């Protein structure tokens, strides 16, 4: 006689709300949040983010990047004043603006770095200053759980 294994699919949601004061400049002009994704265990994974620059000047923008965690040291050491990005860094997501509301679906299981960057760019003649940034991150995914695992938790 075969035992029947019942599997349930449970949705998971994690939300965080943060406010960052990000100084200007290439040395320290960024905030990095790390997250890991295992697409075998976490299917239909999505990272939703809602970003708003709260600085007083109209047109203040922030750069948003998502790269692999293993590329962070190369990115940090890159002097960005020439406006280019290192060729050996794969950008999984790149955008800039005063308000950004978007969703990232990772293509592979990896450890990722979510970067808010206030580094200078040569093509931008504006004076860079510290920016206050509101960020809401929402991680959502589904996971298969054996019913026996649920019973053991209760």
Identify the role of each PLM range.
Residues 1-154:
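Acidic, Ser/Thr/Pro
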């Amino acid at each position: 006689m075969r035992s029947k294994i019942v599997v349930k699919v449970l949705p998971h949601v994690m939300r965080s709300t943060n406010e960052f004061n990000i100084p200007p400049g290439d040395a320290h002009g960024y905030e990095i949040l790390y997250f890991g994704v295992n697409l075998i265990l976490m299917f239909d994974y999505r990272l939703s983010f809602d970003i708003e620059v709260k600085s007083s000047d109209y047109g203040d923008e922030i750069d948003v990047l998502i790269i692999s965690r293993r590329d962070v040291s190369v990115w940090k050491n890159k002097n960005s004043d020439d406006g280019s990005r290192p060729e050996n860094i794969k950008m999984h997501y790149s955008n800039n603006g005063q308000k950004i509301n978007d969703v990232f679906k990772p293509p592979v299981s990896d450890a990722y770095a979510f970067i808010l960057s206030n580094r200078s760019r040569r093509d931008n003649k504006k004076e860079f200053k510290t920016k206050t940034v509101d960020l809401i991150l929402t991680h959502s995914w589904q996971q298969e759980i054996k019913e026996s695992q649920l019973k053991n938790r209760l």
